[in-house]
Amino acid sequence: MAYSFTERKRIRKSFGNRESVLTVPYLLQMQKDAYIAFLQADRAPQKRMVEGLQAAFQNAFPIVSHNGFVEMKFIEYNLAKPAFDVRECQTRGLTFASAVRAKVQLIIYDRESSTSQSKVVKEVKEQEVYMGEVPLMTDKGSFVINGTERVIVSQLHRSPGVFFEHDKGKTHSSGKLLFSARIIPYRGSWLDFEFDPKDILYFRVDRRRKMPVTILLKAIGLNHESILANFFVFDNFRLMDSGAQMEFVAERMRGEVARFDLTDKAGKVVVAKDKRITVRHTRELEQSGTTSISVPEDFLIGRVVAKNIIDTDTGEIIAKANDELTELLLKKLRTAGIQNLQVLYTNELDQGAYISQTLRADETADEFAARVAIYRMMRPGEPPTEDAVQALFQRLFYNPDTYDLSRVGRMKFNARVGRDESTGPMVMTNEDILAVVKILVDLRNGNGEVDDIDHLGNRRVRCVGELAENQYRTGLARIEKAVKERLGQAEQEPLMPHDLINSKPISAALKEFFGASQLSQFMDQTNPLAEITHKRRVSALGPGGLTRERAGFEVRDVHVTHYGRVCPIETPEGPNIGLINSLALYARLNEYGFIETPYRRVADSKVTMEIDYLSAIEEGKYVIAQANAALDNEGRLTGDLVSAREKGESILVSAERVQYMDVSPAQIVSVAASLVPFLEHDDANRALMGANMSRQAVPVLRPEKPLVGTGIERVAAVDSGTVVTATRGGVVDYVDATRIVVRVNDAEALAGEIGVDIYNLIKYQRSNQNTNIHQRPIVKMGDKLAKGDVVADGASTDLGEIAIGQNMLIGFMPWNGYNFEDSILISERVVAEDRYTSIHIEELVVMARDTKLGSEEITRDIPNLSEQQLNRLDESGIIYVGAEVQPGDTLVGKVTPKGETTLTPEEKLLRAIFGEKASDVKDTSLRVSQGSSGTVIDVQVFTREGITRDKRAQQIIDDELKRYRLDLNDQLRIVEADAFDRIEKLLIGKIANGGPKKLAKGTKLDKAYLTDVEKYHWFDIRPADDEVASQLESIKNSMEQTRHSFDLSFEEKRKKLTQGDELPSGVLKMVKVYLAVKRRLQPGDKMAGRHGNKGVVSKIVPVEDMPHMADGTPCDIVLNPLGVPSRMNVGQVLEVHLGWAAKGLGQRIGDMLQAESKVAELRQFMDTLYNKSGRTEDLASLSDEQVVEMAQNLTTGVPFATPVFDGASEADIMTMLQLAYPDAVAKAKGLTPTRTQAQLYDGRTGDAFERTTTVGYMHFLKLHHLVDDKMHARSTGPYSLVTQQPLGGKAQFGGQRFGEMEVWALEAYGAAYVLQEMLTVKSDDVVGRTKVYESIVKGEHAITAGMPESFNVLVKEIRSLGIDMELERS
């Protein structure tokens, strides 16, 4: 196998027993594909699919005027190139977006010449119209909105279609199941059907008042007879003089109790009265040739007439359909000579009379009356004119403008009602309504099953593209209304399309969605894993989704269809549990938005390499084996029974029945969960915490790869976009800390393209969470790269692998109570080595505005500040980069004009003596806030157009241009070197007709001559061969063209930088100062492993006091062993053992390198290590130099991969431990024979501890809950306006709440003075606290408590209730 540039530097030993048949797909595919489909920017306008922007435009256009003589048609749209790139937008606080320009035609028809059938075109005006700006997605799947990176989270919502359910017996006290159906369109009115406890079927539109369903059936054109014919089968009777003959239908008789003696043709009694009719009885009757049965008169009484019965002589209706038969009615029928009679066949069991009963409750007579009833329900109080009634009914379900079932809805609807085709009209049809009512009645009759709304076949994902399209449609709909009103004017006035279209509604809709929607979220950038997880999140919340308060347990619970689609582990703790989920590792979306997961096809128990993606609906049809099913050498399933799943149930089946098999054991979990080694040994709750806390790990100064990983680390790092990967293969030409220049391979450089790739690295950039984004090159000059190779590491990555923590030597033992209740004891060495030191960057902004009293000014000339306080500011009043600042230091000097105040004579005198300036401005400089300190790492100055730039702003622009020129020079250098190489090959050996340095005609060109001539003069050589001469000329033209294009791009960049910045209104100048703060580990910081084992640092202990091994190796961290058994996260113990083996193996390799062993010995040891168990590695493909380089990288520990659910077994761990620690080493370290525990010694006394201790290496993380951010102190500060009590919280510089229980504690101690102080002067006694302050200033400590303000508030509250209460002072 071929290893990438970084993989071969450090191969991760994998214990996976199953070769992956499918590589993990690109993890941001869902987001990126959805937005590409929305924009279709790369497709030619005429080849665009009807989706996204194209669909939105086609839906809104053409717009026709009210009179029909003016029409506006949409032709195509184009996206302009964005004015600024992503980094520029972030710096300037702009939105990374592209302008949409739509080409529209305004067609005016001739009124005189046009007829109703055909219109004659009078005039056509075509124009490109600006249609707002659409934000563009960055390469990393995020959006830059107003300078900040945001993510649009995908929404999991109920799919359009029809759903049948029941209330589970909760509505009625008897526990009767009340069935209901709901037709949900993508856009339009919801239609509900529901049974009530009396078995009458009702319908509702948009959850309004319920009405009998037969009203709706009449409104769609059915009458009583057709309604009954659709829902019932009929019994046929022939009336006799007394009684009647009933047509014998065996199925209908079976199971009934005979109400009279049943006789056959011969008159023999087959079933006696009151006996149940069985299958034997009906068979006897059939065999005797019985076709009809005599029934008594009372058998007909109460039966329901199926059709209208008309007297043929008079034309009078004797009985209407749905009338009940009575003695009187039977008499009438006989008198009229009616012999044949059809009645409804009903029974209690599976043929209920529900529709018949509903029809009886319905008072409407015909179709129009039914529609009027619906109109009155929808528009109460409005007069129902015929036109209005018909228009409303059409608009409810039959108008494509107001009702859209969507492709998904139609597919789901047809599938549910049992139709074969998946396409059809996007509006409702009469057949649809009838089909739904039939199925609902069938369900009530006991046939069929209700739907499970939590099944992923009934929930679909709305991605960013679809959500943005809906917003764009909203904007276009608003435009449509406005344009329709104004189109009439276009006939009289010479208006162009841009006069009619105002793009503001579109811009407003998009701005509102991307800036403020619940699904548009501030991107979590704590570390690369947090970034990637945020983009793969699916939320059930948001517009059109659920709300936290109303979501029940069922929606939140893990469903069988989540398998391979949604992670059952990763979800937040708290009120959002189960509502926000993560996409599983291999999951993708199908064309309808349903989540699919891949499976390998199995044919005749042989597992093939064919892979099919199945949605939750399709999966229910198959038997699917697990990924760890045993296979023989030919890939056949072995064993009599195979563990498999069918319809969500786990079953054991024979190998022949299996149709599919999982592609990977890790396919059920998400990215974050798949990064937890030994996940299968952790309790689910702790695994959830582990996956969630991995996202909160702060990037540390020197990232370190996990010794025990899962093999997904590289995929996650590369797909997150944190690392820099080579876009094309080539050779590294130049490297420094800020840029990498790669000379591209000839094969990959397209004709006419510049064969140079320059990667500018991000240095000390602030993330959304104030962590540090920083890239470091990992290549050197001359390295050969292939496309996709990692060339630079980012934050929290190490050699292209995700590295969110540090490998620490852990000991599980109590230590003087310092690790009680999950506290963590840590060695001073960890702090000294900066293992957990992180850099945090704060952005501080100051704006100079235009005020009523004059303009604010950014200056060094600030009143009442000493020179010492100003010594770090430059002449522009801005601090220099590199300054170390403390709380209160001035960063940017700013003065604001003050209002004129009347001055006393003394002040006037002082002003006259000391000058005017100091008094009419006040100091509003930007200073370092309390609790902050650090180093200034960057300053950015933005100036509004028309305002003169200061020196600092000009210097920043010059530096930026210098950097850009450097890039262009590098590109030009490589392009020219490449061109001159080609020229040299072209000219050597050719005959010349003359050239520089008096080259004689007919001279053969050689290398010596060319070396002697200046390269730029090679173009002056005149080759004798015309072909060579033309090639030389074309190379020259190409070089000149390249140089010209570089000059143009430099000019464009200069223009961008020198033009004025877009600033908020009223702002003249804005300065951003970036402070970098180093945060070392300290007590109070939160730390965690990857298994949900979290804790707070309790003490940092000197190295010499830490428990140590026999050879003097001290532990880095001591954890409490009691934290393991009750939490059931045993994975951490296995990780510690395997980490211990990894470290030992690294030390053995290090010893071999130190002893300068032969490469053959190294290869042999590595072969034993990599190829004796687990997945084998192709070490033979590496050269000796590469083996040595890899060995040097392994000295700190051999990285292991233990894939989830397919990881290292106990035997594997033991093998590695034995290999890592030969007997001599184990003895020196004081290890037990199994190498899993060691004898530790107390660092303070040197005594051995009572028993051996589990020690080993664990990947431990520092989380983004730092004590520095949480802790603060206050003496005086802001107070609440009404109660006059101090505010709460660090952000408000608030105080500590002394609550009810704390008051009880003081009361219990009898600390009366302290209590009085707490309730008065330290809280809300305004006068008292002022006096205390004064007395402290004077050096006295007397406290005079007064009246708390809260008492006055209470008095006011009581007075508001009308009770006057006064306080009498005695």
UniProtKB/Swiss-Prot annotation:
Biological process according to GO: DNA-templated transcription
Catalysed reactions, as listed in the record: RNA(n) + a ribonucleoside 5'-triphosphate = RNA(n+1) + diphosphate
Enzyme class: transferase
Record GO terms (molecular function): DNA binding; DNA-directed RNA polymerase activity; ribonucleoside binding
One cellular component (GO) term of this entry: DNA-directed RNA polymerase complex
Similarity remark: Belongs to the RNA polymerase beta chain family.
Protein name (Swiss-Prot/TrEMBL): DNA-directed RNA polymerase subunit beta
Species in which this protein is naturally found: Polaromonas naphthalenivorans (strain CJ2)
